[in-house]
């Protein structure tokens, strides 16, 4: 009996170590793809699909209950759950089929998911673009570029305000676009990374305290 318990514990530990190594390998692949390609606006890129899904369900749910604040709050919760279930189901199906067919294919698909969870290159590129425009004294260009890293109204900002907003937004987004996705991807692999980024996308879409989302985004 003791031997069975020892063997079972050994197998569990070995399985966990294998899963952790696999997650780290997928994360390394995803990070390399992110630094190489950034966030392309193409249909096959998971983040693009998630944004389109959130935008479509957001409009549908919000318009259906726009005259009832309580119903809007419930609709926002329902939309979040539905999006997460869809993303989780698609991700799990792809991983199951991928690893079933070939370990390398499964690892590649998991790496794609980790890639979609990260936006390190996009953050670096966007912030660099703002700073170059600000140094050149091109206010309109700096205002336009800073919108890629912040959801604030930038139309009335001067150069100093644009630079300050960029620094603050980079500090905030470093956690959302780099540190947190790396953490969840390292522990739970591509599934953990892509689900975290899905929550982040939903929050960025409906979480603002504007008149439009004051109830729906709660």
Question: At which residue positions do the language-model features occur?
Answer:
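Short, Lys/Arg-enriched N-terminal segments with co-localized hydrophobic residues
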Residues: 1-18
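Hydrophobic N-terminal alpha-helices or hydrophobic patches in metabolic proteins across all domains
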Residues: 18-218
């Amino acid at each position: 009996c003791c031997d069975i318990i020892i063997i079972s514990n050994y197998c569990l530990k070995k399985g966990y170590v294998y899963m952790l190594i696999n997650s780290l390998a997928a994360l390394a692949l995803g990070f390399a793809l992110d630094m190489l390609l950034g966030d392309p606006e193409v249909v096959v890129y998971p983040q693009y699909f998630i944004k389109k899904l959130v935008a479509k369900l957001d409009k549908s749910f919000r318009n259906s209950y726009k005259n009832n604040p309580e119903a809007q709050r419930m609709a926002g919760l329902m939309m979040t759950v539905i999006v997460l279930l869809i993303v989780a189901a698609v991700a799990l199906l792809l991983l199951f089929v991928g690893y079933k067919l070939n370990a390398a294919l499964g690892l590649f698909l998991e790496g794609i998911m980790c890639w979609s969870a990260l936006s390190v290159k996009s953050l670096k590129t966007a912030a660099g673009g703002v700073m170059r425009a600000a140094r050149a004294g091109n206010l309109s260009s700096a205002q336009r570029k800073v919108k890629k890293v912040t959801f604030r109204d930038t139309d009335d900002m001067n150069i100093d305000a644009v630079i300050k907003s960029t620094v603050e937004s980079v500090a905030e987004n470093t956690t959302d676009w780099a540190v947190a996705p790396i953490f969840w991807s390292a522990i739970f692999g591509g599934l953990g990374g892509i689900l975290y980024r899905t929550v982040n996308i939903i929050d960025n879409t409906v979480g603002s305290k504007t008149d439009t989302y004051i109830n729906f985004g709660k």
